[in-house]
Amino acid sequence: MIPKQPKSNILIFLLENSDHLGLLKSLITFLPGRYGDSELFSEGLYSVANILQSYLDYRSSGILLSNNIDKISNGEKVPPPYYLTTLRWITTVQSLELFFEMLATKKGEQHDDSNSNNNNSNNNIKKMIIFIIELLKAILRLKLLIKTNGDMLVHHSFYVPSKDVKTILENNRNQQKQFQNKRPAVTMSINNNNNINNNDNNNINNNNNTNDDNFNNNNNNNNNRRTLSDQIFEQQRIVNQENNLLYQQQRELQQNESTLIKLLPPPPPKDYNTKTIGEILFIFRPVIYWVSYCIFGKKSWKPWFLSLVTELLSKSFSEYGNFKQKIRLTLLEAKELNRRKKLLFFYLIRSPFYEKFIGDGLLNKFLNFLKKIHIFKTLIDILINYLNVYRTRYFYTSAS
């Protein structure tokens, strides 16, 4: 489903200036107390800004698709119409997930530490909230997988630069002005014709008792009036033809400059079985990790290994497909698999790997050595603080 074209002036203004939200989110990130006392408040503001950005990107994608454009200015593909609605819900959940985790954590911290029953209860509530969020995202992605007939999920956002939207909206406004400027000429011609007819009718009424010569002249005037009317209607017909020709030329030019959007999902891929298995493993990997994390605990290696094995199996099934058919990856699939490879770096800062090899290991000793150099001391302190903060929240390192 493609979103409708905007009509509100406020919405058009926001769409044409949506990139400025990035500056607002950067300011929120560096607010005083962002990772301290004001963490929950600032994360709430950040979530609201993300939701607004997601909505504007959703509407911007609809504008591009409705104008038969499927690429933004940097060459990235816009998700097809059957992606948009479900993908919008996924991005909305992702915008709120960290806020809900912080809210559950802050509620737990307000209780007395000596009350172990309350602590366990609040900890269970936090675990349940994270599980529900991960399961909800998995269900939405599974729905998207069904919509794509088992093809790889290659779209995870629908960001559109505001300059692209502004260009399209300005072109549409200019086209409307061109059509409107054609209409006054036809209207003026018709009004002139009506004035001529009214004047001639008055002359006929004033000369009812004239002689036969005047009567013949009036007949000639009637013939002239009919001829003038025919000329005006002919002029109107020519103007309409010019408008239709101009509109057709603009549509042909627009189609030549863009790619015709496919409104229907593609057929199932030839390597349907292996690719679908790979995508299902990719979709449910976060759920598998979190459930095992809740069962075995933070210090156990089982959740870490189970998640990593699931990730590698997913990559193998999705990347290699059916060897016998020798199916080659598309450009979008290759980019998506490369993106998933980069997400493997999150395993370096997850427990218990981080505590074992980084937090108290070689990297920590190396950073402490660099801190002795005065130039690097401040930068190293900031890096370590951010690393410690990012490890305190599950969704910072979940890569889901």
Curated annotation (Swiss-Prot):
The keyword rRNA processing does not apply. GO terms for biological process: peroxisome organization. Residues 190-224 have a biased composition (Low complexity). Residues 176-226 are annotated as: Disordered. Keywords: Cytoplasm, Peroxisome biogenesis. Disulfide bonds: none annotated. InterPro entries: Pex16 (IPR013919). It is found in: Cytoplasm. One of its GO terms (cellular component) is peroxisomal membrane. It holds the Pfam family Pex16. Required for peroxisome membrane biogenesis. PANTHER family: PEROXISOMAL MEMBRANE PROTEIN PEX16. Belongs to the peroxin-16 family. This is Peroxisome biogenesis factor 16.
